[in-house]
Amino acid sequence: MSFANTSSTFEDKMCEGNRTAMASPQLLPLVVVLSSISLVTVGLNLLVLYAVHSERKLHTVGNLYIVSLSVADLIVGAVVMPMNILYLIMTKWSLGRPLCLFWLSMDYVASTASIFSVFILCIDRYRSVQQPLRYLRYRTKTRASATILGAWFFSFLWVIPILGWHHFMPPAPELREDKCETDFYNVTWFKIMTAIINFYLPTLLMLWFYVKIYKAVRRHCQHRQLTNGSLPSFSELKLRSDDTKEGAKKPGRESPWGVLKRPSRDPSVGLDQKSTSEDPKMTSPTVFSQEGERETRPCFRLDIMQKQSVAEGDVRGSKANDQALSQPKMDEQSLNTCRRISETSEDQTLVDQQSFSRTTDSDTSIEPGPGRVKSRSGSNSGLDYIKITWKRLRSHSRQYVSGLHLNRERKAAKQLGFIMAAFILCWIPYFIFFMVIAFCKSCCSEPMHMFTIWLGYINSTLNPLIYPLCNENFKKTFKKILHIRS
């Protein structure tokens, strides 16, 4: 890893003694394997960068952090790994001090940028889950880019001690020109401090963030289950609409739910069929005004049937009044209310029209003559029912949008979990060994140290493989670029 540096493999005298023995033809198979890992790392990270650049679906704020991580991994695979292999097969560093400092700078900067990229990615996922509405206003590409630039800026601060350590501290007395190592390679306190700040502290914070993310997603899932248990789903509304139709045909049966219809499929209920528009989305229901005139009003349909009782002022139950009735019976009176409501939620507009139909008993007569008390209770009840139904629809719309958001965050949390798991498993062995060497120089084991270093480098190879496993858009784009048929 950057903080001890690849060349720290040969920092200690005990490790240096093993270095010459490793430079032999027997290293050829190892060099081939390590070179293959380097090439695969470069190829996969270039594939990720090209996929994000070419596919518009991947142009998201969250993927900007993935791009930052891929750039850091690309530097590791294209610069750090090859020069590590080159130094492994050489008996001494013969490429000059400037190239050595360049390699050390790339090692430290790229490795630190990789850690910080995972860290800010974790913070982004954490805020998206914990504060979805508040953070949504601030989660822009500009702010994400500024955060990424800040992470890379702090990573580039490593250049100061690498190039200018001798300006602040006296140079190491044992520094040799035939070795590629930093001026602070033997400063234990500085190495421990940088390891804590650049690895242990961010890793602990990431683990804490991820625990919070896991609990938040789990809490949202439980809340959604409880909400779905108390309110009907859209499919339940459709099933209950069928029950409402049957209730309208059978006297004495009441249905508490409205009928939610698709205008292009279901016929209207309680409306004059001749007045229906040919447009599958628009209808022209018949409306009876207070003066008894017949009107036609265009509107979008959302038919709601509810059986209402006839007001006492409209019913004359006595036999004398029945005999005095001079006009024919009116078996059905339709009170229609059309309302167009629109609400935008994630670029989707919900347009609803609600129609209230009241049916009287066939044996009930209504007297239109003078002195008749006209009750408006049916109309008021219809409007109240429209408000209740609208609240239900609005609640379901929010639940649907919340469900989409929850699914996205669940997948993002899963992707972050895999990235963090690979990161910790690959780098924790090196840093444990690094801390041991810092306190016990005689404990250096050359093969083990090299193994932990390259295990950390392999993390840059694994990251591009994690993205398509956890993101369907990445998977489809990779298949499209590589011409792989599903």
Curated annotation (Swiss-Prot):
Describe PTMs of this protein: Phosphorylation at sites in the second and third cytoplasmic loops independently contribute to agonist-induced receptor down-regulation.
Name used for this protein in its record: Histamine H1 receptor
- Provide the primary localization: membrane
Transcription regulation found in the keyword field: no
Write out the biased-composition intervals (Polar residues): 347-365
Pfam families from the UniProt entry: 7tm_1 (PF00001)
A Gene Ontology annotation in the biological process aspect, one of them, is:
positive regulation of nitric oxide biosynthetic process
* Residue numbers carrying Phosphothreonine: 140, 142
| InterPro entries membership | GPCR_Rhodpsn, GPCR_Rhodpsn_7TM, Histamine_H1_rcpt
Which residues are histamine-binding?
107, 112, 198, 430
